[in-house]
């Protein structure tokens, strides 16, 4: 096989034209884009997302239907702060949401009420960044998609304790009551509404319009109607009645109190059902006024429907009215007031648009399951649905149909960001609509406007609580680009409306055959969430209905269709009953299968079939895995458990100072970096005009039309982040890889850094590895490292910590940031500026002051010494205490940045603020004027000599008449905020340009407005800070961490270990040419772990290093043994990678050859510096008086129960007594012991430990009284 070269890598894939990967962030970006539909004009917006929320809640009317508030359109203004500002100031990156609302009056009495159209502010909404995240309170967050049960109908089966199979059908709506139909052990079918009261299914049928037994039996075609005559009935003697013979008569009753006569309908049963016709019965029937009777058919299929007859027997009702009353009583536990209210209950439950909604998905699933043809727009239940479900259940009972598999992906769908936001906005707008209605009712006679009615806080409070507290709104894992992209593509079965960890069984967590190409079978967390949190596969997309789809090529008559039409995305349901061939099945040049038998998949089987039987073919063997799993070369040679660890650990790799892309990759590394949006990418073709370490400037190519309609400069400036802190305290530090004068193309990556090199993912380093023990130091997966790794910064990373100190207003006065701190030496404050903030560049050691702050002390009587100090130094000296922020015991680093945010000083005179604000107004008004002049120039040029087709505003008032010439004067008079951008002229091209110019003008105008608002706020209010906080200081400290003993490292195959020893270069084992190896791994870690991929990688990468080439070996379609042998032979290396090594200490050759190669190793985020902790004295728990636990609390170790047992076993009673009392929580005893030690006195008798007091109080709380003697 001849390998192909792409992107500087030699690719071993057998498929030469695989499908291009879809955008990896499409899940997030498309969903949010579809939710807002900002690029779509209002009249063309689909009824989905935000538009649908407005459509569902508007128009709003008051209770008398006098006033109507109608929704016309919504739009958003530019954000107040940039993403960078939000991150550094701890703010939310949001945009103001505004709606154009129209208020009018329908009541002729209110003639003076004019129709009002206003833009109403509905609150700020968090806005997604270009990389699919949200910035909430200064931290990047991700909304994880949720995998939940699809709305629709589900048929299930359970086993009763006596062995009877019970069947059920459950209808799950998008919103509204659940209804379940189930059989019981007596072969009777019941309906359960909201899992509460049960009623026979025939009662429900009567209540929805199938009143008589005849109507019910006719649904299933079960009864034969016989006209009542003596001759007819005589013929039928011996046959059983299928329905009751009833006699209906009117009974007049007089009310005892009022004497009023009330007519009551009475029903008497003449002959019950299931009774044989006899001479006596015939007489009774003839005497009643019945016209026809129903008899059992003689057909054979009636036995299948015995459940209906059994249910009719249990049914207490005989008419629709009785059934409605029965349902009402069951649900409400009360008697209905009248027939209408009884009917209303059942109508509201399932047949009302307001209360019940199956959603697009629910209707689609029910139609598909029951082969119905009901209009997709009907989102409520219909009688037809209920009848078909009952029929299907009867088929189930008779073993003529099968139950649903709840874990099948056709029964589970994905709630993406857009849908979750739609639900939240739905809640917020519904609340807002209520308050609007209340305000309308209150302000009946006043003149009011939409702004008076709407309360903007309602929506933003719901949305903010969703982003801040919802389980699916998660703090983004930002350790490296892979961690980011994986987090955004994650699917969780947990969260509101999903499963809970405790209730989820094995089946839900297990891999299902429908996961193929949709959900990754490998990447999932270890631990309690296993199988509940999964990742999307590389080619998977989410359909409009929320089902996960995967692409296949169509195969017709044994020939694969490689055209664009032949490629289709299939949901799990569409893939059912299809035979799918593997992606790397051998084909000839015409796309026909070479072999007579083809390996294929058919649902959960793997048959060998003839080419003609194949329906579809995988697009690529990579399609089965997620991004992280697809990054592991030779994945096919690894055990699944280790592959799982490998894909999870790559997400924990810290970005290195000098990263290197792997010699052996899988070909997906470049695509990942591009789609992660972490690097700066050229938007289109252009030329680099300026480059330095902090910014890149590019002049983009523009067409004449683009140049004309744009108000932007052609040169775009990109600023590069330098040592920016991530959520996980790793760093993003980008540097340019383009030069001045370079031509760039659209999509070209212009920078590297943050775990990338040359536009490819670079999580670690390629190191020379030997699989051999080294003096026992690599026992139990430990790793022996060459000192060169430390010296040459192979695994050095930079970590940035942020330290914050807030200045508050306290009851005793204002706190203050200062370097003048009481009782602190000058030496300790030498690096602080006048605000008490440490200078940039200062080296920090444990205990150093980072931010100096003083706080007013409590007013208690001063001691004589304090009185003297106050007399000498004035009032200031004694009334403040040191409240500075000091470096923690393990903090060592360099200050790289400091920030100080302050609210505007109150002392500023009002006049100076007014002056500044009016100057700002002038400056920005001038900018708006210039922008408007440029707009008029452009429009005048466009419309020169053109006849106008009419220019209208939102109220359809004609501002420029049709047929007139467009003059500059006319154009200057237009307000572009209220005009409709419909066709102004007869020329389509001109109209397009006019629209583009106007849209660009409005965008710039709004940006200028937002900037002005922002500047005014800065002048009047200062920085936005939470309530009660006057100032906030931030210090950023960078720590350079070299690899050291105790750090965790791993390869890509789940081969993890802890560095146990760093050995001098000359002591490491070396190759025959004198090259010392970089790392020694224990060979015993390979056989039991069954991750042989690492050996393949090591051998191939060694050849790659020797030949100075890089390889791509895609998973399940990578390098074969022959390919590897070819490259090892070219490089002059042993085919099996085994070679003799020499002892660094003695120079002797080792007895056996060892496997040597080059492996890609990562340094993980579990570093010993973060874990190392020791305490002598520190904080105690208030209640038990014992030391706190954990590094974060600076806690200590406790002498626990098992340690006490050890001392007891040795009989060390005095030591034990000391440990449990004076050395622990005997508060009085320990201070006395301290005194005794200081004075040299004998130790006092121990007292009562505090923990015993706690126990005594607990017992007293239980009502037990006792005393200690």
Curated annotation (Swiss-Prot):
Its EC number is 2.7.7.6. Gene3D superfamilies: 2.40.50.100, 2.40.50.150, 3.90.1100.10, DNA-directed RNA polymerase, beta subunit, external 1 domain, DNA-directed RNA polymerase, subunit 2, domain 6, RNA polymerase alpha subunit dimerisation domain. It holds the Pfam family RNA_pol_Rpb2_2. Signal peptide: none annotated. Keywords: DNA-directed RNA polymerase, Nucleotidyltransferase, Transcription, Transferase. It is an enzyme of class 2 (transferase). One of its GO terms (cellular component) is DNA-directed RNA polymerase complex. It catalyses: RNA(n) + a ribonucleoside 5'-triphosphate = RNA(n+1) + diphosphate. InterPro entries: DNA-dir_RNA_pol_bsu_ext_1_sf (IPR042107), DNA-dir_RNA_pol_bsu_external_1 (IPR019462), DNA-dir_RNA_pol_su2 (IPR015712), DNA-dir_RNAP_su2_dom (IPR007120), DNA-dir_RNAP_su2_hyb_sf (IPR037033), RNA_pol_bsu_bac (IPR010243), RNA_pol_bsu_CS (IPR007121), RNA_pol_bsu_protrusion (IPR007644). One of its GO terms (biological process) is DNA-templated transcription. HAMAP family: RNApol_bact_RpoB. The RNAP catalytic core consists of 2 alpha, 1 beta, 1 beta' and 1 omega subunit. When a sigma factor is associated with the core the holoenzyme is formed, which can initiate transcription. Belongs to the RNA polymerase beta chain family. DNA-dependent RNA polymerase catalyzes the transcription of DNA into RNA using the four ribonucleoside triphosphates as substrates. This is DNA-directed RNA polymerase subunit beta. The gene is rpoB.
């Amino acid at each position: 096989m001849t390998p192909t070269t792409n992107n500087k890598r030699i690719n071993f894939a057998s498929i030469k034209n695989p499908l291009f990967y879809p955008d990896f962030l499409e899940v997030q970006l498309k969903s949010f884009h579809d939710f807002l539909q900002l690029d779509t004009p209002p009249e063309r917006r689909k009824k989905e997302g935000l538009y649908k929320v407005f459509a569902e809640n508007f128009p709003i009317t008051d209770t008398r239907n006098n006033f109507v508030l109608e929704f016309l359109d919504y739009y958003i203004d530019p954000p107040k702060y940039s993403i960078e500002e939000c991150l550094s100031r701890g703010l939310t990156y949001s945009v103001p949401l505004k709606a154009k609302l129209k208020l009018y009056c329908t009541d002729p009495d209110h003639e003076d009420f004019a129709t009002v159209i206003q833009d109403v502010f509905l609150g700020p909404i968090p806005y997604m960044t270009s990389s699919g995240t949200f910035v909430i309170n200064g931290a990047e967050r991700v909304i994880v998609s949720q995998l939940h049960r699809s709305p629709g109908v589900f048929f299930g089966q359970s086993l009763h304790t006596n062995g009877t199979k019970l069947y059920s059908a459950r209808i799950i709506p998008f919103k509204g009551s659940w209804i379940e139909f189930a059989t019981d052990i007596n072969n009777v079918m019941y309906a359960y509404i909201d899992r509460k009261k049960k009623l026979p299914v025939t009662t429900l049928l009567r209540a929805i319009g199938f009143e008589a037994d005849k109507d019910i039996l006719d649904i299933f075609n079960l009864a034969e109607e016989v006209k009542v005559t003596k001759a007819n009935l005589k013929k039928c003697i011996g046959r059983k009645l299928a329905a009751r013979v009833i006699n209906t008569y009117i009974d007049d009753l007089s009310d005892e109190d009022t004497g009023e006569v009330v007519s009551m309908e009475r029903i008497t049963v003449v002959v019950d059902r299931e009774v044989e016709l006899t001479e006596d019965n015939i007489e009774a029937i003839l005497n009643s006024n019945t016209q026809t009777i129903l008899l059992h058919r003689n057909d054979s299929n009636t036995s299948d429907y015995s459940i209906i007859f059994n249910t009719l027997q249990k049914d207490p009702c005989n008419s629709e009215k009785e059934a409605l009353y029965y349902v009402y009583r069951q649900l409400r536990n009360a008697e209905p007031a009248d027939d209408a209210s009884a009917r209303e209950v059942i109508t509201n439950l399932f047949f009302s648009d307001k209360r019940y909604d199956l959603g697009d998905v629910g209707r689609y699933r029910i139609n598909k399951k029951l082969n119905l043809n009901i209009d997709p727009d009907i989102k409520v239940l219909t009688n037809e649905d209920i009848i078909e479900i009952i029929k299907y259940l009867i088929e189930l009972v008779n073993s003529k149909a099968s139950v649903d598999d709840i874990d099948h992906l056709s029964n589970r769908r994905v709630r993406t960001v857009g849908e979750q936001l739609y639900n939240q906005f739905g809640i917020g707008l519904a609340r807002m609509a209520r308050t609007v209605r209340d305000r309308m009712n209150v302000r009946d006679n006043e003149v009011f406007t939409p702004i008076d009615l709407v309360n903007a806080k309602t929506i933003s409070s719901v949305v903010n609580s969703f982003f801040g507290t919802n389980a699916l709104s998660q703090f983004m894992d930002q350790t490296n680009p892979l961690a980011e992209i994986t987090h955004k593509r994650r699917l969780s079965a947990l969260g509101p409306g999903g499963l809970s960890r405790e209730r989820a069984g094995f089946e839900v967590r297990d891999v299902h055959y429908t996961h193929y190409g949709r959900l990754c079978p490998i990447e999932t967390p270890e631990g309690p969430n296993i199988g509940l949190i999964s990742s999307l596969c590389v080619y998977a997309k989410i359909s409009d209905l929320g089902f996960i789809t995967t692409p296949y090529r169509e195969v017709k008559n044994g020939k694969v269709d490689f055209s664009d039409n032949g490629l289709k995305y299939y949901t799990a349901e569409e893939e059912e009953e299809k035979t799918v061939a593997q992606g790397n099945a051998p084909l000839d040049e015409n796309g026909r299968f070479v072999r007579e038998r083809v390996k294929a998949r058919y649902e959960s089987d793997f048959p060998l079939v003839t080419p003609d039987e194949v329906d579809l073919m995988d697009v690529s063997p990579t399609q089965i895995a997620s991004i992280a799993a697809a990054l592991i070369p030779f994945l096919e040679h690894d055990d699944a458990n280790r592959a799982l660890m490998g894909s999870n650990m790559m997400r924990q790799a810290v970005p290195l100072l000098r990263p290197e892309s792997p010699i052996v990759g899988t070909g997906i590394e470049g695509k990942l970096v591009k789609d992660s949006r972490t690097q700066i990418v050229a938007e289109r073709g252009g030329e680099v005009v300026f480059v330095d370490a902090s910014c890149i400037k590019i002049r983009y190519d523009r067409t004449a039309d683009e140049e004309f309609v744009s108000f932007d400069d052609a040169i775009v400036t990109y600023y590069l982040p330098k040592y920016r802190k991530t959520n996980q305290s790793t760093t993003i530090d980008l540097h340019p890889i383009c030069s001045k004068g370079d031509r760039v193309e659209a999509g070209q990556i212009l920078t590297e850094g943050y775990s990338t090199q040359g536009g490819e993912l670079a999580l670690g380093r390629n190191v020379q590895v030997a699989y051999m023990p080294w003096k026992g130091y690599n026992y139990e997966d430990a790793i022996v490292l060459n000192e060169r790794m430390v010296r040459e910064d192979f695994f050095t990373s930079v970590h940035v910590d942020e330290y914050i100190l807030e200045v508050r207003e306290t009851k005793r006065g204002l706190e203050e940031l200062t370097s003048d701190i009481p009782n602190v030496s000058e030496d300790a404050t030498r690096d602080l500026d006048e605000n008490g903030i440490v200078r940039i560049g200062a080296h920090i050691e444990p205990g150093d002051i980072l931010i100096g702050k003083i706080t007013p002390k409590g007013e208690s009587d001063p001691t004589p010494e304090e009185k003297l100090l106050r007399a000498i130094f004035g009032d200031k000296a004694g009334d403040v205490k040191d409240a500075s922020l000091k470096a923690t015991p393990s903090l060592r680093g360099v200050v790289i940045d400091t920030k100080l945010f302050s609210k505007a000083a109150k002392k500023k005179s009002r006049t100076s603020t007014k002056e500044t604000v009016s100057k700002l107004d002038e400056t920005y008004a001038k900018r708006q004027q210039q922008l408007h002049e440029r707009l008029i120039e452009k429009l005048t040029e466009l419309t020169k000599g053109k006849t106008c087709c009419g220019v209208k505003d939102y109220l359809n008032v004609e501002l420029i008449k049709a047929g007139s010439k467009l003059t500059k004067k006319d154009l200057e008079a237009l307000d572009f905020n209220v005009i409709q951008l419909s066709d102004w002229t007869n020329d389509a091209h001109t109209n397009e340009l006019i629209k583009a110019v106007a849209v660009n003008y409005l965008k710039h105008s709004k940006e200028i407005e937002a900037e002005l608002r922002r500047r005014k706020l800065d002048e009047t209010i200062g920085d936005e800070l939470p309530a009660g906080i006057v100032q906030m200081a931030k210090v950023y400290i960078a720590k350079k961490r070299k690899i050291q003993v105790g750090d965790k490292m791993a390869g890509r195959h789940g081969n993890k270990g802890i560095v146990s020893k760093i050995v001098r270069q000359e002591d490491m084992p070396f190759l025959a040419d004198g090259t010392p190896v970089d790392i020694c791994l224990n060979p015993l870690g390979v056989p039991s772990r069954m991750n042989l991929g690492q050996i393949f990688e090591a051998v191939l990468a060694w050849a790659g290093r020797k030949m100075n080439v890089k390889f791509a070996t895609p998973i399940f379609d990578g390098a074969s043994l022959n390919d590897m042998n070819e490259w090892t032979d070219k490089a002059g290396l042993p085919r099996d990678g085994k070679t003799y090594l020499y002892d660094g200490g003695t120079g002797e050759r080792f007895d056996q050859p060892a496997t040597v190669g080059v492996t890609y190793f990562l340094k993980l985020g579990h570093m010993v510096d973060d874990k190392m902790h020791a305490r002598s004295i520190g904080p105690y728990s208030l209640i038990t008086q014992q030391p706190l636990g954990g590094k974060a609390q600076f806690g200590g170790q406790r002498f626990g129960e098992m340690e006490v047992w050890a001392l007891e076993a040795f009989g060390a009673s005095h030591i034990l007594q000391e440990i449990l009392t004076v050395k622990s929580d005997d508060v009085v005893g320990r201070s006395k012991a301290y005194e005794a030690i200081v004075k040299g006195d004998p130790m006092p008798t121990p007292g009562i430990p505090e923990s015993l007091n706690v126990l005594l109080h607990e017992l007293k709380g239980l009502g037990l009284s006792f005393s200690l003697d």
